[in-house]
Amino acid sequence: MRLLALAAAALLARAPAPEVCAALNVTVSPGPVVDYLEGENATLLCHVSQKRRKDSLLAVRWFFAHSFDSQEALMVKMTKLRVVQYYGNFSRSAKRRRLRLLEEQRGALYRLSVLTLQPSDQGHYVCRVQEISRHRNKWTAWSNGSSATEMRVISLKASEESSFEKTKETWAFFEDLYVYAVLVCCVGILSILLFMLVIVWQSVFNKRKSRVRHYLVKCPQNSSGETVTSVTSLAPLQPKKGKRQKEKPDIPPAVPAKAPIAPTFHKPKLLKPQRKVTLPKIAEENLTYAELELIKPHRAAKGAPTSTVYAQILFEENKL
């Protein structure tokens, strides 16, 4: 019996330890890329889930690399006993004060804080977690996982330049808008002035058309007596045509210098006797008798009205 027990113990001692499998689910937030301004405080969270054993402990390590191609450097580590350790250049007092690793939620959430960011802090941050538990009086790693994020630090000069460029673009847009507004106002004012000028011109033109023109012509005296003839012409309103034509001044009809005289002299014909009218003697002494003879004119000149009649009056005194 003792021999069997010793053989079984030897076989168990020679049995291999359990292999480490990547069963942990590790994620880093914010990510995959996060931007911060120079001088701000950055916070990175490492979430852990899917542990294989409930009683296992976690060892968290943060690595830093300036780029994907560069070598990763261990920054800080939290052991399974929750002790924080700093490594390399990050163990110096200047950088050590700027790094803080805390366990927010036991076995699930870990926070890395980088205070007062500098341009040299820009790069890739990797969180690697290992699940450890005690197996046969030895600490054994059961699973592990990792996740990374990229942090970009924007310098103050670059941010100022970008803000200045944005303000410059906005001001340029408003300047263009102001110019367009001024042009639109000028066009509106000019159109109003032109409209008023057209209205005034039309009113003046209509007044000129509706005005009546009179022409007075004084005929020369006859050889036989004094005769005055007046001719008045009225310009009728003509309908407007498609195109405006020049107004021709109204020319009065031509009046001959002298009334036509018959070539032969006719003896004056006495008037028919009229009824005697008894008038006072004083009035009879001052009476003067006249003989009126109507003569047809020769062919009328072109343009002269045919309704014109010329008269010749001969005066004779009757001696009583």
UniProtKB/Swiss-Prot annotation:
Residues bearing attached sugar chains per UniProt: N25, N41, N89, N144
Gene Ontology CC entries for this record: extracellular region; membrane; plasma membrane
UniProt cross-references to Gene3D superfamilies, sorted A to Z: Immunoglobulins
InterPro entries the record matches: Ig-like_dom, Ig-like_dom_sf, Ig-like_fold, Ig_sub, Ig_V-set, IgSF_V-set/TM_domain
Cell compartment(s), UniProt: Cell membrane
Cytoplasmic side: 202-320
The name this protein goes by in its record: V-set and transmembrane domain-containing protein 4
Lineage: Eukaryota, Metazoa, Chordata, Craniata, Vertebrata
